[in-house]
Amino acid sequence: MTFLEKLRKELEVDEGVMYSVYLDHLGLKTCGIGHLCLEGEPEYDWPPGAPVTEERVAELFGKDISITMNDCRWVIDDFEQLPEEVQLICCNMMFNLGRPRFSGFKKFIAAIHVQDWKTAAKEMADSKWHRQVQNRSGRLITRMLAVGEDDES
């Protein structure tokens, strides 16, 4: 399975997949795999419940993942050199948080730079984000800790 296939699979679990426009927990129009409908996109003017094709969901996801990957490279300059599992975790967080909020995880990012996976996991756990999305963040924290365990073996 390619990196993008792995990422899509985990984001489908964390975000869900909706083939219609719906209102997210903030009342914002969303569709597909956690795609926020933006002004200028056709879905922005559609009512909740309007169907969205599988092809359109794939197109929007492709654009969102491209932005997510570029944002990860922007915030973490050595992103491409990180273990794949850490890249997946960072992309999942970036997809969920967006670049401005992800960039606020300064100690997490510093720990990633020095490959201190335990500190990175601690910083993930010690955040408002973790309290907001405990199931998702809990899985990602466990995975980050496992990267550290793999290094010790």
Task: Locate each region found by the language model.
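Substrate-binding/active-site groove segments that recognize
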Residues: L23-D45
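Alpha-helical segment that forms one wall of the substrate-binding/catalytic cleft
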Residues: Y44-I76, E84-C91, F95-F102
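Surface-exposed patches in mature extracellular/periplasmic domains of secreted proteins
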Residues: Y19-Y22, W74-V86, E123
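Alpha-helical scaffolds flanking conserved acidic
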Residues: L4-R8, Q81-C91, T119
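Long, amphipathic alpha-helical surface segments
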Residues: M1-S20, L26, H35, V52, ...
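Generic secondary-structure boundary/loop-capping signal
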Residues: Y19, L28-I33, I76-F79, N92
